[in-house]
Amino acid sequence: MDATELGVSGEGEEIDMEVMRPLIESEDRFEGTYGEKKHLQRYLNSDNKKDEEVMKPLIENEDDSDGTCDEHQYLQRHPDLDNKDGLTFFQTLIHLLKGNIGTGLLGLPLAMKNAGVLLGPISLLFFGIISIHCMNILVRCSHFLCQRYKKANLGYSDTVGLALEVGPGVLQRHASFGRNLVDWFLVVTQLGFCSVYFVFLAENIKQVFEVFLETKLQQSEIGIWSLDLRIYMFSFLPLIIPLVFIRDLKNLSLLSFFANVSMAISLLIVYQYVIRNLSDPRTLPLGTSWKTYPLFFGTAIFAFEGIGVVLPLENRMRDKKDFSKALNIGMAIVTTLYISLATLGYFCFGDQIKGSITLNLPQDSWLYQLVKILYSFGIYVTYAIQYYVPAEIILPAVTSRVQKTRKLLCEFTMRFFLVCLTCAVAVLIPRLDLVISFVGAVSSSTLALILPPLVEIITYHKENLSPWVIMKDVGIAVIGFVGFIAGTYVTIEEMIYPISYVPPNVSHSDFGVLNNTVLEGH
């Protein structure tokens, strides 16, 4: 609000602005120009709950379907009121586990192959510790900015934007860019997840269906045939499209509950199989070449990229002072789960490990075929939840540019386009390991490793950070950046020249013939 909007004459503008200054300034001390303060106050008055609303589907309670928790009332409630109906410690812990366990977990045994039986577990532990530390950094920076500028809560992109806004002068004018950058990487990450789901569903259901078909055809003495993997991807498109038109995800709460149960049962069955069928780890390499390690990095960071749900969870927790404990316990469990399944899976299947460990399970047992069906059901339902995030970021920006009478048509068109886009990416890169590694290297490394330490340096730039903290933050950001560059380069090279991918039962000498028809090996 300026002086002219208040009906003040130009001559008295300076006096009136002095009078009105308390209405537009923060009560806390802020060292900067008056113009900077006005710009900051406009930023603070923006809708900083957008991140929480966008990421909300990833942290919803499964018991919301009973009507005991009205989400709309929660979101409309004044943010400064008591969070009496917030998440308990146990609920927060469960949501942290749910937000970090998905297809990335099943791809870690193959990632272990790209790192080695010794270097792999050590690297996973290292990346796990760094990821947890970066999550805590983001939470601390959010708390600092909230307390200093009297905000109830902040999301990821708002935290980055406000940190830039109150940072050094050269960065202040880039606050909007910082927020948009985080939103863009969130969109890339979530749509990347959705593309991974297409490949995962196609590979697992293809295997189940063709084993079933093979059994029937052998009984009738008819020749065995195999469909291209891309046919299965396209066949899932009409099944997934209806999911993305569901606006209120509470309608999926019951399905989401059964999906989580299905995935948990599947993991238990996978664990018991690999533990009972361990091979001698001394036959496996301790380490691998630098050319395959970036693929490991991308997959590992993809698996650990749960930082997008951290602040929304903390904002909805009933007793926020316990969040750090829940975060550390939850991520410690996740890290243990990752290292154990990755190591045991690689010990069990060795060099024959595939993009998803479920694809290595025996095909002649109904129990292990059921594992693929159950986990695929869980991933199918999860698609709608992951898709919600980029849709809520992209759709408002697009529909705001069209006439009101065409907004609904525009929204439906964009929803249809985005789901087709994720399918197209899966068709173009029909290898589960490469899609996971590419998404991890490009966007997950930025969100999980690069931005949090830089945000800490900017947020506390006036608080006399110790040289050790600055060196630590710069070191983490450099690791993330090197992984970003190397992982992206090696993954793209592998897409063009897939020399490290050898389908099962195919020798390296014969693989040159199949290099251009890799789909037939799935």
Swiss-Prot record:
Protein source organism: Xenopus laevis (African clawed frog)
The entry annotates sugar attachment on: N515
Keywords (alphabetical) are:
Amino-acid transport, Glycoprotein, Lysosome, Membrane, Symport, Transmembrane, Transmembrane helix, Transport
Query: Any keyword Kinase?
Result: no
A GO molecular function assigned to this protein is: L-alanine transmembrane transporter activity
User: Biological process (GO) annotations?
Assistant: amino acid transmembrane transport; L-alanine transport
The domain of life is: Eukaryota
Q: Which classification does the entry list for the species?
A: Eukaryota, Metazoa, Chordata, Craniata, Vertebrata
Which protein, by its recorded name, is this? Neutral amino acid uniporter 4
Q: What is its main location?
A: membrane
State its location(s). Lysosome membrane
What is the role of the protein in this entry? Uniporter that mediates the transport of neutral amino acids like L-tryptophan, proline and alanine. The transport activity is sodium ions-independent, electroneutral and therefore functions via facilitated diffusion.
Which PANTHER family did the record assign? AMINO ACID TRANSPORTER, NEUTRAL AMINO ACID UNIPORTER 4
Provide the membrane topology annotation.
Answer: Multi-pass membrane protein
Q: Which Pfam families match?
A: Aa_trans (PF01490)
State the family named in the UniProt similarity comment for this chain: Belongs to the amino acid/polyamine transporter 2 family.
Membrane-crossing ranges are 115-135, 181-201, 226-246, 255-275, 293-313, 329-349, 377-397, 409-429, 435-455, 467-487
List cellular component terms (GO).
lysosomal membrane; vacuolar membrane
Name the chemical reaction catalysed here. L-tryptophan(in) = L-tryptophan(out); L-alanine(in) = L-alanine(out); L-proline(in) = L-proline(out)
